[in-house]
Amino acid sequence: FTYTPLRNDLYNLDTQQEAHQFEFPYADNTFDVVVLTSVFTHMQPAEVQHYLIQIKRVLKPGGHCLSTFFIMDKNTPEILKQNKDLMQFTFEYDTYYLHDDKVKDANIAFKKIAIQSMANNAHLNIKLLNNGWWKGGDKSASLNYQDLVIFTA
């Protein structure tokens, strides 16, 4: 693990180093497993795309990446609209939604098709997508509060 303070408008305004330009400080084909919990839920699309490319680079062939997202499928906007107790993503953009348009890295939900597109662009496969209970799903059918995605190299 290497701590690197990167700029984020929610957590860290004290640096100019940007996530979309950060090169992971590891050699190619180093890791069997990469884990990101509640990271992509605070990153913009270009940053997530860059990280997925970096993850593909550092994963060994056949390696896995366990990550969490907030994923909006075709039914999610209506589910959220009907239940205001759930986290709301009301600011829609081309491939994602924001919880707060004034703090863009606060909470980000990606459209499901955007996750697939970013995986394809990074030459990763989606092995598993498990819906979290953040959008009112059945807790017993979910592995996590956030949506869980396992990518393979």
Q: Which positions does each model-derived feature cover?
A:
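A short, conserved alpha-helix within the catalytic core of class I
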Residues: 15, 43-54
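A short glycine-rich, Lys/Arg-flanked "PGG" loop and its adjoining helix->strand segment in the class I
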Residues: 27-28, 49-61
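Conserved sequence/active-site signature of Rossmann-fold short-chain dehydrogenase/reductase
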Residues: 39
